[in-house]
Amino acid sequence: MMKNKNLCKILYYTDRDALDRPALTEKQCAALMGKNIKIIPKLYVDSSVLAYVIISMDNFAPSTNPQFKDNIISFDIICHFDQWQLKDFQLRPYRIAAEIDSMFDNQHLTGIGELHFMGASQIILNDEFGGLTLLYQAIHGGEDKKNAPNPADNKKIVDDFNELHNQSFIPLDTFISNE
């Protein structure tokens, strides 16, 4: 998310012309994480921060890949109502949603799965903050198994070892005479 220059500008600048403002430095983009972009679903309202994206995972379910579970990833986009309006009749939370959707819809993220847009709904927190929730289904397939240990591989190694060991093994009783 930090590599999306438009998203960083919309979150960082509170002006209507946020997209026309200079690109953020790497340090400024990195500072958005934890301040504007959160993975802990607790919102501390900061008077200097007026746009937030809260990322959470929920509704875990079994998948075809036993290493991972399918789940729903939600992006809660919260903006101060005074900051909703951007230039050209664009609305800040909807523009943030468009940037997020362009990055995640139908994309495969290693260890998370393939994301599919499920829908969006408006959220109103209070008389000052509101926005949207975007929902994506994360589906884990076999491609995420590539680097995961496979018990069947271990069985083949054990079988090969036993076969080799048993071929070179001469039972002790062949050396003992029963006379």
Where are these predicted regions, by residue range?
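Residue-level recognition of well-ordered beta-strand positions that form the cores
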Residues: 56-58, 74-78, 135-139
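Short acidic, glycine/tyrosine-flanked loop/strand segments centered on an H-E-D-like triad
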Residues: 70-85
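Acidic-leaning, charged glycine-interspersed low-complexity segments
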Residues: 90-149
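Small/polar-rich, solvent-exposed N-terminal microdomains that initiate assembly or binding
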Residues: 1-63, 158-179
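Broad gene-expression machinery/nucleic-acid interaction feature
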Residues: 50-52, 70-74, 131-135
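Short glycine/proline-enriched loop/turn "hinge" motifs that connect secondary-structure elements
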Residues: 63-69, 126
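A generic structural signal for short coil/turn motifs at secondary-structure boundaries
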Residues: 64, 84-88
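Short, charged, solvent-exposed linker or helix-capping segments at domain edges/interfaces
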Residues: 86, 145-157
